[in-house]
């Protein structure tokens, strides 16, 4: 088995988590991709006095350092903001497990080297039940063979688009993928110039 990633899973038992809940709009003041981790889930993580909310799941000591987020349906819905995956990744999340993702958010995850895995609702429900019984669920992710494994559950298979999988395995974003095609692009331009010298 080829392990792409291993990490601790933290459960966020909420449907329809939109990008404004992931990172509220008042924190969208920079395009540097840095410093957004403190604002992640701000309205849930903090009380009115900016003290950590002890009732919020990610503030529990057992989930400090979690790198896999388990959540529900339609994660990342709402307005398009790449700051949302930036905040998640800077906080430490590398993988998100959900029943479905908003399309733009899903693509932004891939562009930022985050693995977003859509799982059937019954599979997610089993993982949430397990998370109520155990707060130390570590998952090994074999991206090549598209499986999740753990000492707490039987192997789980998942689907992923081929282009997303290849980009994650290669570590390339869209620009990097385009640069790998430079020889073909150069050859096409030379051929076009020869066939249409008037252009």
UniProtKB/Swiss-Prot annotation:
Gene3D superfamilies: Aconitase, domain 4 (3.20.19.10). InterPro entries: 3-IsopropMal_deHydase_ssu, Aconitase/3IPM_dehydase_swvl, AconitaseA/IPMdHydase_ssu_swvl, IPMI_Swivel, LeuD. One of its GO terms (biological process) is L-leucine biosynthetic process. It comes from the Bacteria. The keyword Metal-binding does not apply. Its EC number is 4.2.1.33. It catalyses: (2R,3S)-3-isopropylmalate = (2S)-2-isopropylmalate. GO terms for cellular component: 3-isopropylmalate dehydratase complex. CDD domains: IPMI_Swivel. GO terms for molecular function: 3-isopropylmalate dehydratase activity. Pathway: Amino-acid biosynthesis; L-leucine biosynthesis; L-leucine from 3-methyl-2-oxobutanoate: step 2/4. Belongs to the LeuD family. LeuD type 1 subfamily. HAMAP family: LeuD_type1 (MF_01031). Catalyzes the isomerization between 2-isopropylmalate and 3-isopropylmalate, via the formation of 2-isopropylmaleate. This is 3-isopropylmalate dehydratase small subunit. It comes from Pseudoalteromonas translucida (strain TAC 125).
């Amino acid at each position: 088995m080829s392990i792409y990633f291993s990490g601790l899973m933290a459960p966020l038992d909420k449907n329809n988590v939109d990008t404004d809940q992931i990172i509220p709009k008042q924190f969208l003041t920079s395009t540097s991709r840095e410093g957004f981790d403190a604002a992640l889930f701000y309205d849930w993580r903090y009380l009115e006095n900016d003290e950590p909310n002890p009732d919020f799941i990610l503030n529990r000591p057992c989930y400090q350092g979690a790198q896999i987020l388990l959540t529900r349906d339609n994660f990342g819905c709402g307005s398009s903001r790449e700051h949302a995956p930036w905040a998640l990744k800077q906080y430490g999340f590398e993988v998100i497990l959900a029943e479905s993702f908003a399309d733009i958010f899903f693509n932004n995850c891939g562009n930022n080297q985050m693995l977003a895995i859509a799982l059937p609702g019954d599979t997610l429900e089993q993982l949430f039940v397990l998370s109520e019984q155990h707060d130390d669920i570590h998952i090994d992710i074999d991206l090549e063979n598209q499986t999740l494994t753990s000492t707490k559950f039987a192997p789980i298979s998942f689907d992923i688009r081929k282009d997303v999988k290849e980009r994650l395995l290669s570590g390339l974003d869209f620009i990097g993928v385009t640069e790998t095609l430079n020889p073909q692009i150069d050859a096409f331009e030379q051929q076009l110039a020869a066939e249409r010298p008037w252009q």
